[in-house]
Swiss-Prot record:
Cofactor(s) in the UniProt record: Mg(2+); Zn(2+)
Protein name, UniProt field: Phosphoribosyl-AMP cyclohydrolase
GO biological process, one term: L-histidine biosynthetic process
SUPFAM superfamilies referenced in this protein's UniProt entry, alphabetically: HisI-like (SSF141734)
Role noted for this protein: Catalyzes the hydrolysis of the adenine ring of phosphoribosyl-AMP.
Any one GO molecular-function label of the UniProt entry: magnesium ion binding
Pathway where it operates: Amino-acid biosynthesis; L-histidine biosynthesis; L-histidine from 5-phospho-alpha-D-ribose 1-diphosphate: step 3/9
Binding site for Mg(2+): 74, 76, 78
UniProt binding sites for Zn(2+): 75, 91, 98
Gene: hisI
């Protein structure tokens, strides 16, 4: 059994959400033990809002829920990679992914 490192980030685990089909990274959020348990129980993503200090069910208001396909754990057991089948855009701006901007703007780093 894998033991997750909840202590490193004060009870939170960084969670990368990826589209199971396209492999596009959709968003990064945080889970606590309760949100991970709800995710496992419902098959839909739940996160911990650091700003509101509350659980949130992705898509509860927008309808853009994320159905979980797999959950992988990184080598340090402090980050999760959750692959999902999204019902719509992941970003609150309406973009498919929260990673729709590039830095620096309009420039390649190569």
């Amino acid at each position: 059994m894998i033991t997750l490192d909840w202590e490193k980030a004060n009870g939170l685990i960084t969670t990368v959400v990826q589209d199971a089909t396209t492999k596009q990274v959709l968003m990064v959020a945080y889970m606590n033990q309760e949100s991970l348990a709800k995710t496992m129980a419902t098959g839909e993503t739940w996160f911990w809002s650091r700003s509101r200090k509350t659980l949130w069910h992705k898509g509860a208001t927008s309808g853009n829920i994320q159905m979980v396909k797999t959950i992988a754990v990184d080598c340090d057991a402090d980050t999760l990679l959750v692959t999902v089948d999204p019902a719509g855009p992941a970003c609150h701006t309406g973009h498919i992914s929260c990673f729709y901007r590039h830095y620096p703007e309009g420039k390649d780093l190569t």
